Amino acid sequence: MSPTLAHSSPMISPALVARMTRTFVRVAEIWVPTKDGTKLQFLDGLYGSLSGFRAVSEPMRFGFDEGLPGKAWAAGHPIILKRFESSSFERAEAAKAVGLTCGVAAPVFAGDRLMAVLVLLCGDDDAHIGAIEVWHNDPATSYEMRLVGGYYGTAAMFELNARYTRFPRGYGLPGRVWKSGMPMIVKDLKHSKAFLRWQEATEIGINRGLGIPFPHASGQTWALTLLSAHDTPIARRFEIWVPSAEHDALIFNAGDCDQNTQLAADYAAVKIAKGEGTIGQVWATGLPAVRDSLAADTSPAGRSAVAAGLESMVAMPVMNEHGLKALVAWYF
C-alpha cells in the first residue's frame, strides 16, 4: 500500500472555482486501433456538457491518414489543425455546432506499434489565452526546432513571435524536451530559466508549461507544448511520473498545482503500482486514459487531486520500444 499523503490542500474559494471552469481545452478523446489494425475506434473521452458531440463521435472509425486521428497515425507525430474543415476533420459540422474550431492529435507509439491517439479539441472564445504548440527539428536541414503550428486563443502577438522563434537543442521548453527525450514541466514562467519566452508569456497571463517529446524513427523530433494561463487554464495541475530504479512502481518526478504547492513533499514516499488508479492503469495498458470523475480513484494521486478540488484528468504514457519512459497527467 502507498503511504498516506502528508499534506491536505487549502479550501478553494468559490471565485476560483468559477474562474477555472473556463478551460482552454474543451474535449479530450482517446482513439485506439481496431482488432484488425485497419482503423481507429473510439475508446473514451472527456466532453463536459457536449454530450451531443460525444454521441456523434463514439460510432466513428478513422482509417490510416483519415480525419485528425488518422492523420496523426500516418504522420507518426502530433498534428494540429487550427481551423476545422470537412476535408481534414470529418466531424467539422458537428464541431462547429458546439463551438469547437481547432484541435491537436498526438499518437502514442511503443516502438513502431501504434497504441493510441490522444485528441484535444478547443473552441474560439474572446477570453481564451494560452497555447498548444507543435515544434519540429529535422537534423538534415537544421540544428534548431521551429514552430510547425499552434493554437493560441486570443494571444495573437504571442503567436506571431513564436513563428519567428527558433530553439537550439537544450534551450527553451521545446529544446529541453528534445535534448532529454523526456517530458518537462515549467512552473512560474517569470522566474524560470527553462522558458525563454517568459516575458511575452507572463504579459498575457501564461504562467506554466508542459512539454512532451515525440522522437521519430527518421531521426526527426517533434515536441508538443501546452502553455496554460491563469484564467483559462489548460489544466489546474500537471504531473510527471517515472518508473522507479527497480521498475516495480511509478514514482513522482515533477508537478505543479494551483491548490497544492507541496506536491513533491506529499508524493516523496509514494509509489504507484501497476494497475493502481488511473496512473497505474496507463502503465499497465500502455494506453492513455481519461477520468470524468476522480472520486473512485483511491490511489495516492487520485486522493491528492480530489483533496485539491480537482474532478477529472487525462493521463498519457511516453513510451519507447522497451516500454514506459514516463507518464504525464493533467487535471481539471
Summary of predicted features, one role per range:
Residues 36-87, 142-150, 154-192, 249-252, ...:
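Regulatory sensory and allosteric helical modules in signal-transduction proteins
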Residues 28-37, 133-141, 146-148, 239-247:
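Short hydrophobic alpha-helical segments used for membrane anchoring or interfacial signaling
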Residues 1-27, 124-132, 229-238, 242:
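PAS-family sensory modules
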Residues 27, 92, 105, 117, ...:
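Short hydrophobic/aromatic beta-strand element in the GNAT-like acyltransferase core
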Residues 117-125, 223-231, 326-332:
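Short beta-strand-to-loop transition segments that serve as allosteric relay/switch motifs
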Residues 109-114, 125-126, 141, 215-220, ...:
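Flexible loop/coil segments at beta-strand boundaries within sensory signal-transduction domains
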Residues 101-109, 208-215, 312-319:
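A short, aliphatic-rich beta-strand micro-motif
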Residues 22, 60-63, 94-100, 165-168, ...:
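Short loop/turn motifs at secondary-structure junctions and domain boundaries
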